[in-house]
C-alpha cells in the first residue's frame, strides 16, 4: 500500500526557501535537493514507519528521516486511517534545534 503525501504550509515554505538557497549556492549539485526530496517522499509513502521518532516526542508523534547528501531532516507524521503521511518540516541539521510545527 502506498500512502498519499500532504505537505504542511510550514514545510512547503521551508522547502521553497531551501530550494532558492540551493539553486543560488550549489551550482555543482543543483539537482541534489530536488532529487533527494523526491526519493524521501517515495520512501515515506512506501514505508511510512521507516523514520525514527523525533526527539523529544512531540504532541503529533512526528518521525524524521535524515537526507545525508544534503544534510536535511524531513519531519513527518503518519495517519493510518487516511493512509497519509504529512510532511511537517524540512530542517537543516546544522541548526542544532528541532523545528516548530504548525
Specify the residue positions occupied by each region the protein language model found.
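Basic, Lys/Arg-enriched alpha-helical interface segments
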Residues: 1-62, 80-82, 98-102
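Enriched for short, Lys/Arg-rich terminal
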Residues: 67-102
